């Protein structure tokens, strides 16, 4: 299984590799947000991927009907390979993200490569959104969830998490609040979007007042 959930552009080296893997018999799945169909992708993009053997779905496609569901967007960047390796972070599939094409000057982004038990959670997040977005055989999903990544010895831990319209708890906000409220030395945050509610502002303020080094890096171009 090669599963990819992220922003995507029309053509490029990565898509050529995905086509090659699909032709070799691998189960390749691509899911992207419906806003891409309004900005960067052609109207028949899903059909074109299907023709080369890539399973593809759109999260919350844009339709000519007014709906509050259009506020639900998929901004995750997740790639899972064979249930053993996963990538996540801020990188979409586009040339400007590796500075092969200049749109906004030099692009600085961050992504992580994970192996070990954390891969299982990212795979579950991807497959959950895949089943919600389209129709899929649940036994097929169970097959992939039963795959176990190789164990890795580590002195720390990695805990992937996700928010979606399916969750009623503010998982991401609670994670940040916990980190801020329990910090003793420093908290460094790098984010493209800084939209703080009063609770997060108070947590940052209290952390700074008790001597914690709180730093935030944001992009120069919003």
Task: Spell out what each predicted region is.
Residues 4-5, 9-222:
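Charged, low-complexity intrinsically disordered terminal segments
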């Amino acid at each position: 299984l090669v599963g990819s959930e992220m922003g995507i552009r029309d053509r490029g080296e990565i898509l050529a590799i995905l086509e090659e893997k699909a032709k070799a018999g691998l189960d390749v799945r691509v899911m992207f947000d419906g806003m891409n169909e309004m900005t960067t992708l052609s109207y028949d993009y899903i059909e074109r991927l299907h023709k080369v053997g890539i399973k593809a779905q759109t999260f919350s496609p844009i339709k000519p009907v007014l709906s509050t569901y259009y506020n639900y967007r998929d901004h995750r960047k997740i790639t899972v390979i064979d249930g053993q390796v996963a990538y996540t972070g801020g990188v979409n599939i586009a040339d400007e993200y590796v500075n092969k094409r200049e749109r906004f000057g030099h692009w600085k982004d961050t992504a992580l490569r994970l192996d070990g038990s954390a891969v299982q959670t990212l795979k579950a997040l991807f497959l959950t959104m895949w089943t919600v977005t389209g129709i899929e055989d649940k036994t097929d999903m169970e097959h992939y969830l039963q795959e176990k990544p190789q164990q890795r010895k580590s002195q720390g831990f990695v805990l992937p998490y996700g928010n979606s319209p399916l969750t009623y708890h503010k998982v991401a906000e609670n994670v940040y609040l916990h980190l801020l409220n329990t910090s003793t030395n420093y908290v460094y945050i790098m984010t493209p979007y800084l939209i703080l509610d009063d609770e997060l502002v108070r947590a940052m303020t209290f952390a700074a007042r008790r001597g914690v080094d709180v730093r935030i890096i944001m992009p120069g171009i919003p």
